[in-house]
């Protein structure tokens, strides 16, 4: 959520920033609500001043033992004034609720370093690591490799649950588990605290990280009692410190979390229908940071390097891309996408998204900290990134390490977890 004081003081500046993101916001509605809010506040202040003055007069008259008729008349007037005041205060609450709702639909403001652009075609490549894999045979897609090896079963998963689901079997299931354990081990060795959170969360948690109210159509919801299945561990892990005031000495806090994730993929009709790239249920290892504001952009670079390290150790070619203003996520001030090379598709595909939200999520979730030698509190900055998406990493291994005979070489760092060198 944006700072309401900034929104009130800088509507034109905000409109310009959001135009860069491709958001068309009706600020006239907001300004109209603000004008009405200010009028109601003045009226409330005036009536409260009258009430205080008359209350003092009544007390004074009682002290002087004045006639009851005068006192009763003033009391009756105050009763009527109280009813009017209650009605105006109710109107003010309704206006403030509308203002709050308006703020909940406003995206974050892009950082000055974010490249300008309309969509993903104008994202900017920052760096590459490794050379795209080349073969002396026609490389297969991961779904063909998985079915030939008998380690992925899409057909039976479809029978059980429908499209966009998969069953991992045998060495496929073991590879998935090996990747989870490898990533958790790697990140905890770097100082991240492992967290295993609930995968069902309440509405307040979803609102705190920015999924609600704007993206409800992409969430799986349980109606009674009301819960949401998490689309990413970002949601429960960020909400660990919701409504808390941390000390400066506690920061930075680094968490790593493995969870299943669930997404409707409502806007993805016809995209990646085959394979593991876009599933309703998938596993992911997530990195989440709580940091001081002045450190957050250095922490974003560090977070991105931590995600990159996974791919380097697995020997998977990748590139890092800075998202342009038009492709930036709703809550993000700046994002790097890490894209891994997939020979079966002949292109790079996103495997991690590393973002700095500045204080956007912290305002929504009310996560603050207190400096050692300073009064008051400040909002922390939150960051997160995939470290990595397990299914897409498995896809990259199958496609980059495939052999002419249909087997797949196991990356060296995974062999202690797998107990084998080759999947046949």
Swiss-Prot record:
Keywords: Aminoacyl-tRNA synthetase, ATP-binding, Cytoplasm, Ligase, Nucleotide-binding, Protein biosynthesis. One of its GO terms (cellular component) is cytoplasm. Transmembrane segments: none annotated. L-serine binds at residues 232-234, 286, 386. Pathway: Aminoacyl-tRNA biosynthesis; selenocysteinyl-tRNA(Sec) biosynthesis; L-seryl-tRNA(Sec) from L-serine and tRNA(Sec): step 1/1. GO terms for molecular function: ATP binding; serine-tRNA ligase activity. Gene3D superfamilies: Bira Bifunctional Protein, Domain 2 (3.30.930.10), Serine-tRNA synthetase, tRNA binding domain (1.10.287.40). It comes from the Bacteria. Its EC number is 6.1.1.11. ATP binds at residues 263-265, 350-353. Pfam families: Seryl_tRNA_N (PF02403), tRNA-synt_2b (PF00587). Disulfide bonds: none annotated. SUPFAM superfamilies: Class II aaRS and biotin synthetases (SSF55681), tRNA-binding arm (SSF46589). Its main location: cytoplasm. Belongs to the class-II aminoacyl-tRNA synthetase family. Type-1 seryl-tRNA synthetase subfamily. Consists of two distinct domains, a catalytic core and a N-terminal extension that is involved in tRNA binding. PANTHER family: SERINE--TRNA LIGASE, SERYL-TRNA SYNTHETASE. Catalyzes the attachment of serine to tRNA(Ser). Is also able to aminoacylate tRNA(Sec) with serine, to form the misacylated tRNA L-seryl-tRNA(Sec), which will be further converted into selenocysteinyl-tRNA(Sec). Homodimer. The tRNA molecule binds across the dimer. This is Serine--tRNA ligase. It comes from Thermodesulfovibrio yellowstonii (strain ATCC 51303 / DSM 11347 / YP87). The lineage of its organism: Bacteria, Pseudomonadati, Nitrospirota, Thermodesulfovibrionia, Thermodesulfovibrionales. The gene is serS.
